[in-house]
Amino acid sequence: MFWRGENFSLEKLPADRSRVIYAPEPHKPIDDIDAAIRHSLLNPIEMDPLPALLFPGMKLTIAFDDISLPLPKMTRPDIRQRIIEAVLDMAAEAGVDDVHIIAALALHRRMTEDELRHQLGDRVYDAFAPRGLLYQHDAEDPDALALLGTTDHGEEVEINKRAAESDLLVYVNINLVAMDGGWKSTATGLASYRSLRHHHNTHTMQNSRSFMDAHKSELHKSNWRMGEIMRKHGPKIFQIETNINNDTFPDPFAFLSKREWEWNGRDRAKFVATQAALKRTPNRIARNIFHGIEAPHNMTSIQCGEVEAVHKVTTENVWKQQLVEVQGQTDILTMGIPFICPYNVNSIMNPILVMCTGLGYFFNLYRGKPLVREGGVVIMTHPTPNEFHPVHHPSYIDFFEQVLTETTVPHD
C-alpha cells in the first residue's frame, strides 16, 4: 500500500526483487501515566528533584513542543497537558506565582486557540492565556529576545528573553524520532532567527549524513555547540523528554497500521470503501477528515533532568521502538507520501512540503547508510497539486513561483 496524499493505493512490485520495510509493532504504553510523570519529576537524572528547584519569588518558565509533534495529533489528554499540570501543581505547592508558559515555535506558524487547548487542556489555557501568561515564542521580535553569547564557530545564541531571564526553564518535549529533543529543544524551539540561520540552511543539509544520528548531523552539532553557551550563560534547564509508541491510527483507519497480509475481510472492505469514497471527495473535505484523526499513540517512557543525560536515555528508547535492520542498499527506493508532515498540520501539503517530506524527512530516516545507493532512484507517490495555504505558507508561494522557476540549485 502506498500513501498518495489524502488517499492511498495498492501497487504490484517485482516479487523477486523487492523488499518492503514495515515499522515495528507499537510498544505497550505506560499503565499509569500520571504516576510515571510524578515519579520522574521526583527522580530526575543528574539533577535535584523538581520541588527542590522551586521557591517563592522565583521566575518559572515552562516551554513545550508545538503542533509539529506528534503526527497525527494525540487523543486528549495530550501528554504535554498532563506533564504541565503536574509541574504547575508542584509549583503551587512551593509558592511559585510567577509562571509563564511558552509554545516553542522556532519559525513555525502560530497555533490557534483550539490547537493550544487540545495540547494543554482547558484548565491550563483558561488559567494562563487570558492573563497573557500563555503565549507563543516570536523568533523575530527583538524586544522578546536575549543574546547569551557566541559559539567558537561564530554562531550567535539568542533565545526567548523570558526563558533566558528565568530562574528555572522547564522544557516539555515529545520524541517520535531521534532528531528531536536534547539541546535542539531550546536551541531551536526558543531561538531567534539570528540563531536559527546558522543550522537551518542548505550547508547544514548538504553536509549532514543523517538527521537521525546526532554524530553525523551538522544540525545537531550546531545545536549542541549552542547548548554549551546556554549551559554557561543561560538559565537552569530542567528537561522533560517523553517517548511515545507508533500506534498511529484509530478505527476506522486501523488497517493503515497493519501489513497488507494481516488484513482480514473487514480490513480489505474498509480499504476499498475508503479509497473509493476519497476519490469522490473534494480535496478540502478529505484533508479535514484526515487532519481530524486523533491517534491512539501514547507514552512509553518519561525521563527528566539534565539535558544531555536525559536525551541519551530518550534516544535509546526511540531506537528500541523505531529501528528496523536492513541489509544492503537498494537501486530504487519507493516512498508513499502521506497527507501530513510537521509543517502542514491542519493545513495543505504543498509541492515544496512534498519534497521536504520525501527527500528531507523520509530519505534521512536512517542511521548507517541511506536505503538507496548513491546514484540510485527515488520514486515518491503524491498527487502534488499546485495548492498552497495563503495564511500558513505565504512565503512558499513566492518561492515556488519566482525562485524555483529560475533555479533549483540550493546555494543559489
Model segments located where?
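Well-ordered mid-protein domain cores that form the structural environment of catalytic cofactors
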Residues: 77-156
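N-terminal amphipathic/basic leader segments beginning at the initiator methionine
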Residues: 1-38
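Acidic, Ser/Thr-rich peripheral helices and adjacent loops at domain boundaries
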Residues: 117-132, 260-267, 389-412
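Conserved, well-structured core segments that form the ligand-binding/active-site neighborhood
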Residues: 126-329, 336-339, 359-364, 370-372
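Glycine-rich phosphate/diphosphate-binding loops that line cofactor/substrate pockets in enzymes
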Residues: 45-66, 93-96, 325-329, 371-373
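Histidine-anchored nucleotide/phosphate-binding helix
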Residues: 71-95, 191, 358-371
